[in-house]
């Protein structure tokens, strides 16, 4: 289909936007405002609330009273994949777009999604994920998340050109693809998006990353919260690796390898201190170099000081979480 024909058809496509939310009173209004302000106005917006104890529900209900395109649905199982699985059977749109409650997108985002998916060439499309920081540490974390030293070759964090990829953040899919694949796997409450994208690719379809569709995403603002987040990510990845071994890429094994090296170094340090140092020296060198390169782009000393601990927290927490998930699952499997 030509670009002109696709553009002419844009207004004919109802799009379902799914917004999982839990205690997001600080950000839900910004999220809904950006969706309602899209150039493509043929929308339904399903907000899936996982049992918020703050004002999230009241805020969404107010939006729903003012605009019938907004609907509030309950997500009693609370997780992200459960929210998506509650939403897609309700969806009336030809395309389903996930936008989390702590994210915002530019006004042409939905229009660009429709333009890409209406060609029929893609099983899904997504944009570059730009972390946003509100504190000096938060801005350092955002810089790390936008650097290959932090996220390796995960192009959706730092891509500048469109490309076919193995994973898209906050993905948008034809609803027929979602129905065919049966939605998201609720046994992987973390990393469920990667697992779904793997099945999309296994079905013979391709995924497009368009960095022009930038997603502003509120990153963690403290090292402690970042470490907790990446430990969960590591556990989630281990579940996907066990379920789909062929989905594993080299970048997924880098952090677990570093953690294994540190564990071995600690074990042999009393007897072989030099060998112990040799085991971890390569990582420490890369950590120092990467921190210096990322920090050089930041304006304040406070931001620059937070880069090294942010990088280390991401790598080591992810690796620890991966081993916890992998070895914990192995223990459970043997006990059965």
Language-model region placement:
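Cell-envelope/extracellular polymer assembly enzymes that use nucleotide-activated donors
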Residues: 13-16, 44, 195
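A conserved acidic beta->alpha catalytic loop
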Residues: 49-58, 77, 100-106
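Glycine-rich, basic loop-to-helix element that forms the pyrophosphate-binding segment
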Residues: 75-91, 112, 165-168
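Catalytic donor/gating beta->alpha subdomain of glycosyltransferases that bind UDP-sugars
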Residues: 185-248
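Membrane-embedded multi-pass helical conduit in multi-pass membrane proteins
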Residues: 258-332
């Amino acid at each position: 289909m030509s670009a002109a024909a696709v553009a002419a058809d844009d207004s004919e496509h109802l799009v379902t936007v799914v917004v999982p939310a839990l205690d997001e009173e600080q950000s839900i209004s910004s999220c809904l405002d950006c969706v309602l302000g899209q150039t493509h106005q043929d929308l339904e917006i399903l907000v899936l609330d996982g049992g918020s104890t703050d004002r999230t529900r009241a805020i969404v209900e107010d939006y729903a009273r003012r605009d019938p395109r907004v609907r509030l649905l309950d997500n009693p199982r609370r997780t992200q994949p459960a929210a998506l699985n509650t939403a897609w059977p309700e969806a009336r749109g030809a395309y389903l777009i996930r936008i989390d409650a702590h994210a915002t997108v530019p006004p042409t985002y939905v229009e660009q999604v429709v333009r890409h998916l209406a060609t029929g060439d893609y099983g899904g499309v997504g944009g570059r994920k730009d972390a946003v920081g509100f504190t000096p540490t938060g801005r350092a974390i955002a810089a790390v998340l936008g650097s290959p030293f932090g996220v390796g070759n995960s192009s959706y964090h730092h891509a500048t050109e469109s490309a076919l990829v193995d994973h898209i953040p906050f993905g948008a899919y034809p609803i027929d693809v979602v129905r065919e694949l049966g939605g998201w796997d609720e046994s992987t409450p973390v990393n469920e998006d990667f697992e779904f994208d793997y099945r999309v690719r296994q079905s013979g379809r391709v995924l497009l990353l368009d960095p022009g569709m930038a997603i502003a995403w509120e990153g963690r603002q403290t090292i402690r919260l970042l470490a907790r987040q990446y430990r969960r990510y590591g556990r989630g990845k281990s579940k996907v690796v066990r379920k789909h071994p062929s989905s594993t890429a080299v970048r997924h094994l880098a952090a677990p390898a570093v953690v294994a090296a540190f564990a071995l170094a600690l074990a042999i340090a009393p007897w072989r201190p030099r060998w112990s140092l040799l085991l971890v020296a390569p990582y420490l060198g890369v950590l120092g170099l990467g921190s210096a390169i990322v920090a050089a782009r930041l304006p304040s000393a406070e931001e620059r000081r937070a880069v090294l601990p942010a990088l280390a927290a991401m790598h080591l927490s992810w690796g620890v979480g991966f081993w916890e998930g992998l070895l914990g699952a192995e223990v459970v499997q043997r006990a059965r």
